[in-house]
């Protein structure tokens, strides 16, 4: 499952996106953002709901191990119903998936094929996040059997603020939303 994605925008760009979508912005001084690939245990820019708007923070990817297993980085959306205060968005410029069962596996980058920012639906707990996953759309299905829940910019507000579980947003992204390029 997804264990690497890229964020390649400046703090200011994320704040501008949030303002355009009338999400408001409440954040501390802009920190030095990681640029490029984000892997489990590393910090990423996460947008979450806040009183009167939203926040932009740097949070580490992964929850503590559960039942002796490794870091929890992905959660099946079919088994979750996070309340608004536990939802977030990880803006992304691309994510990576692997195909094959034996090394060396083929590595594919998936980037937006549409001219708008995309973000992953995430669950936030104790200042850490995990990606929510769903069935793959046709853009991803040939490479992997799951994909991150990918939200279009117009859906960010509903994901962050809906008092009821927005099950419709947990569906796979529309076909043609992503383009794949083999990188290895």
Please identify what each model-predicted range represents.
Residues 1-184:
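Short linear sequence motif anchored by a di-proline
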């Amino acid at each position: 499952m997804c264990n690497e994605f890229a964020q390649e925008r400046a703090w200011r760009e994320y704040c501008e996106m949030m303002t355009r979508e009338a999400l408001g912005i409440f954040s501390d001084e802009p920190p030095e953002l990681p640029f490029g690939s984000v892997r489990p245990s590393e910090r990423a820019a996460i947008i979450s709901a806040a009183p009167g708007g939203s926040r932009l923070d740097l949070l580490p990817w992964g929850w503590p191990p559960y039942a002796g297993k490794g870091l929890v980085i992905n959660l099946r959306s079919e088994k979750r119903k996070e309340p608004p205060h536990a939802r977030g968005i990880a803006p992304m410029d691309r994510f990576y998936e692997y195909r094959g069962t034996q090394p060396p596996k083929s590595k594919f980058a998936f980037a937006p094929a549409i001219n708008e920012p995309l973000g992953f639906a995430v669950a936030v707990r104790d200042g850490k996040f995990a990606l929510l996953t769903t069935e793959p759309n046709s853009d991803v299905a040939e490479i992997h059997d799951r994909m991150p829940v990918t939200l279009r910019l117009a859906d960010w507000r509903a994901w962050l603020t809906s008092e009821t579980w927005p099950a419709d947003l947990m569906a796979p992204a529309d076909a043609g939303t992503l383009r794949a390029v083999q990188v290895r």
